[in-house]
Amino acid sequence: MQHPVSEPNLPVSEACLRNQAPIADVLAQELEADAFVLEIGSGTGQHAAYMTRHLPGIKWQPSELAGRLEGINGWRQRSAQVGFLPPLILDVSQDLWP
């Protein structure tokens, strides 16, 4: 498990560190190489950074509540992966989605 030692201001989820590799293994088997993934409730943004690094052909669309995008944007900037798209503001409790 790698912690962002060079970027101490990025949020880190220990659960994400534990599960990102097994999730990537399953996604690699199940998704087309150029799949589009909408992640609902992206949290820290770690999954998006990890998945776009390990599955370089995919487009990963993170989403999160307004006010919780800073960490996702930080991970996006750090990862510099083309497939890591800018996060959408999404509240699944609302009737209207972007």
What is the meaning of each model-derived region?
Residues V26-L27, H47-A49:
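Short secondary-structure capping/turn segments at boundaries of alpha-helices and beta-strands
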Residues E32-D34, P56-G57:
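Short glycine/proline-enriched coil/turn segments at helix->beta-strand junctions
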Residues P11, E39, W60:
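Conserved short-loop catalytic and cofactor-binding motifs
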Residues R18, Q46, G67:
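Short alpha-helical
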Residues P98:
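A short acidic, Gly/Pro-enriched loop at the edge of an enzyme's catalytic core
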